[in-house]
Structures are given as C-alpha cells and as structure tokens.
Amino acid sequence: MKVIVLGVLAVALGAWGDGIKVTLEGAVGRKMDTLCLKRAYGSEAKGRIYDEAVNAFRTHYDDTRKAGVGEAWTQGKGLWQGEYWGKTMLSSALVSEYAGDAAFKDWLRTKARAFVKEFQQPDGYLCTYKDRTFVGGPDKDGREVFCWNLWGRKYTMWALVELARVTEAPDLLEAASKMMDQEIDQLEKTGVRIENTGYFVGMPSMSVLKPLLELYRATKKPAYLDFARKIVAAWEREGNPPPNLVANAFGPKPVHEWYPQPAWWAKAYEMMSCLEGLVDFAEMEGKPRLLDAVKRIVAKLEANELNAVGSVGFFDHFTNASACPNATTEPCDVIHWMRVNRALFLATGEAHYLDSFEFAFYNAFLAGVYRDGRWGAHSVRSHGTSHRTAPHQVGMKYHQCCIDNMPRGFLDFAATAVTRGKDGVLTVNLYSAMKAKADKVGVTVTGDYPIGDEAKVQVEADAETKVRFRVPGWFDAVEVDGAAAKGPWHEATVPKGGKTFAFRFVRTPKVVDSKAKPGADPRRRAFEEAREDPGMTNLSRLTPAAKLVYGPLLLAKAKRVTKDAKAILGRDSVQGRNFTCTLEPIEADGVWGAWEATLTDGVTTIVREVCDFSSAADSEESGNLFSIWF
C-alpha cells in the first residue's frame, strides 16, 4: 500500500457490495484514511496494537486477574479483553478488501492462521476465558453475573468468517465453524440457554445472531440456522421475561418502560446488535412480522431515545434520552444505530432510514473520531470542555470498545453510498464526494456536501441505464438540473455514454427546541464524568435549550471559531421563544464549515460564530470548549 508522507493516505479505500466499489473522497475520505492508517494497517496497528489484542488469549486476564487498586468491582466478574482481537481483525479484513491491498490481505491471513494454531483447542474452543463454563447467567440468588465470555467469542468468530472470505482462506472458515459448533455443543450439554448467559438479560450473547447467519451462508450447516431460530424464539417467550424484543415491539410502551430499572437491562449497543441480526433473520426466513417488529422498535427509539446529537440513548442505555437536557452517546451506539437503519433501508427500500443514518454519521459519529486517527471518544457530548475521551479499558493500553469499532462506521457509510434496489436499479443514496464503480456504470460525486449546497453527480454508462437518486428529507427542496425533485426518490434515464446531474440542496437553518421539560433530571454524574475531567464539573445543563440544525448538519459554538467562552457555554436559552436563524459563511481554520449565525425573535438579536458539530471538538485535548445549545 503506497503512502505519501503528507499526513494524508494516498491510496483510496473502497467499499464493496453487490458488485459495487465505492471510494470516499473529500473531508470524509481523508478522515477515514487517517483512521484506517493508524488503526488497521500502519506499523503501530500491525505492531503493538495487534500484539496486545493477541496477548489477551495468553493471559486469560478476563477471568483470572487479581483486582488491583481501584479495580475491586471486577473481582469475581468476567471482563471483555476477548472482544478486541475480533473487532480489530473484523475491521482490518474489511479495510483490506476495500483498499484492494494484496499484501495486507497476506499479512492478515498469516496472522490469523498463527492465532488459530496457537489458541484454538481441538474441540474448537477459542476464547480469553480460562474457564469455558463461566458464561454468566443468574447466580444462586437469581442475580445476573457480570460476564462477557460469549460476547468475546462472537467477535472472534465473526472476524474469522470475514477473514476467510476476504483472504480466501477456507481453513479460517473451518476455525470459525469449529468455534460455533463448540459453543452450541457446550450450551446443550450443560443445559444452559443462551438467553440466560452474559449480562444485560442475555443480549450480548444473543447478538451472535448476525455473524451466525453469515456463518450459515458460508457453510450451509443446518445447525446454525436451527440455533438462530432458538435465539429469535427467545425474544417472544411466555411470561414476558426481559428483553422479549419481538413481543414488546408490538406493545404500546416505549423501550425504557418495558421493565423496571432500564439502566440495568436496556443496553443500547447490544440491543441494536440484536436488532440488526433480527432484520437479517426476517429476510432470510421470509418473516415480515419480525421485520415489522424491528421497524416498530426503531420507531419507539426515535420517539423516546433520539438524543440531541443524532444518535440514540443516554451513554449506552435506553432510559428516555430524549427527555434529558444533556446528551451523551457512545460511538458504539452511533455505529449500531447506523447499522440498524442501513439494514432496514436495504430490507424495505424506505428512504427515511437513510435520513437517520446520514444525520448520525455526519454528526455524532464523525465527532467521536479524533482527527489524528489514533484514538477517539468514549462518549460524544452535547457540550463541554471536550468529548469524553475513551479510557483505556480492562488493563489494555491500545484498545477500547468504541475505538476498535470506528473503522466499520466509515466502511458502512461507504457501502451505503451506492447500492442496488431489489429491482436491480442502481441507487445513489449519499452525496459526499466519492467515486463508485458498478459493473459497467461509473458514478462520481463532487462538491462539499453537506457543508455546501451543491453537488454534481456524473454517471458514465456503456448503455442506456436507469439510475435512482435519493432525495434527502433534511432539505426544504432539492433541485436536479434546475427542476424540483419530488422525494423520496428521483429517477432518471442515463443515455449511453453518460450524463452529469447538477444537484442543489435548498435549506434554511432551523432552531429546534429540546424535547426535555423544565425540571427534567440532568443526569449530571453520567454526563460530566468529572472524575476523568474535572473541568466538566457543574457544566451540565439544568434546563432545556434549543439547537441549530442545517439540513443534515448539527451546528455548534466552539473555541475553534470564537474565543468568547461565555458565549459558548452560557446558560441562557432561546428554547420556546420562536427564534429564527440566518447563516453567513465565514472563514475559519481547523473546521470543516463555519458560519456567522444570527438568531432573532424580532426583538432580541443574538450573533454567534458556529461550525459543524463534527469539527467542534474532535481531538483529545481538554479545554476545547463547545456547545450545541442556544
């Protein structure tokens, strides 16, 4: 892989699917390239980052460590170092495919084979837990035992499936199959049901559904589909034990009211991982009711869990996040909110799922990926001195759950940019700068969307071709070649040789009131995390405020565009006061887009410099003040 030493990766990374290769360019492509260099195939990534993930299988830290200072809470519990090899290699396998880098694929194949040879036991067991039978579940008093054994196995197995496909190594698929065979056999022989393992009412363990179905596609082993059916059946049990996802989907209650104390069971990342698998299962088995169940849960999340930065949940839990005057969201949640919406779009063709996907990506996701590519946020905040930088978890120096997932967020975006509908029509879904190749059709998108208001889409075709363009729901109007495009799709016939389409996105900035009510719980401890960042002390909002939305962009006041700290973190609010806003572009270094915002209700006028939320604080240093609140 060739690299020009200018801080920017020269080689293009492309996403493959349905015979389509997409290469991201522009600001999004550069940020992706930087992350993948630092976290996937650079020398540090292939050195100490990879080695630390492997070492977890030697030390068995997850279930044999001695609790050190400040770690008393871990005694007797199972931890999650076991997820990192799988997450790292899952991302790396996909990066190697998208980059088309044969040397990197060779490196991955060699490392994966050495890993399997060293750690997989003859019966297929491959895990960081020394005690394979420690899979969590209720203790003698009926309480859940904190344990991530099967969760870690899931990621290892998933990585092996993808490595086998990408590097053309059937022995790695065999290793994945042996892993799954051993897990199924162990659960059957010990009489343990998967829904009674792990923590958070079995959802981490049951989230194996998605990679299990991928393994079934690759091997056609009936046992895997049978096991998938058992998992899905466990979400519709009599007596309504939690989480009962399918049964509860059809009830009237929002997710956080399904059972008491949602902070102890309604884990966002793991539930959405299950939902993604359920979409796949519904499609595979031809079960429209199950697909409807996921659609209903997503609608419940949009109604009660959509947070102010475009993701769902409050710090990885579904606890009525929309009602809180502060917002904080894990990148893992953002990525899996994107993945669920992507899955529903591919299954249904309904464009509104792409609106949710797009807003989450441009705002909460990009904000959490630090611009140097080395690290990122554990929680993306609505405001503060910085986002909450990811801590080094469970004895690791170079891994953290959100960081290891981040390449997949970009890869999912690339794989969603251009797709084929179920009718075979090529569909342009996203308008970031990119190049795509689908059989004999080429697509090039230029412009600075969504900072700019225009994009050109050049379609090259050897023969007359129909193309479908998404009309994003974020705009007041969308024009194609000067004529209004009526959403959600604009269809056009491209003549032989090709055609260039000129898109204009018409938008006005919107002052959007918070759904939080006066007196709502600000959840200060979880939002501020002042033990890690004392500068966040007392920075929680105690009352709701409004935010500025400009098409699919969330705007923020930030130190990078203004030095007035009081203006950034001031407590005053235009919430409920019928303010409107106009924007004028301004020049500012270090941000993607910047504007002067003028807010007025006809009597009072407020002028503030703002930038795109993703640029406001996407770095590790503290004191980088920012806020979305007005």
Language-model-detected regions and their locations in the chain:
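Low-complexity, Ser/Thr/Pro/Gly-enriched N-terminal "stalk/linker" regions
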Residues: W16-Y84, A102-G136, P170, R229
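Solvent-exposed loop and edge beta-strand segments that line ligand/cofactor-binding
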Residues: K66-W85, G136-T156, E188-M206, P241-E276, ...
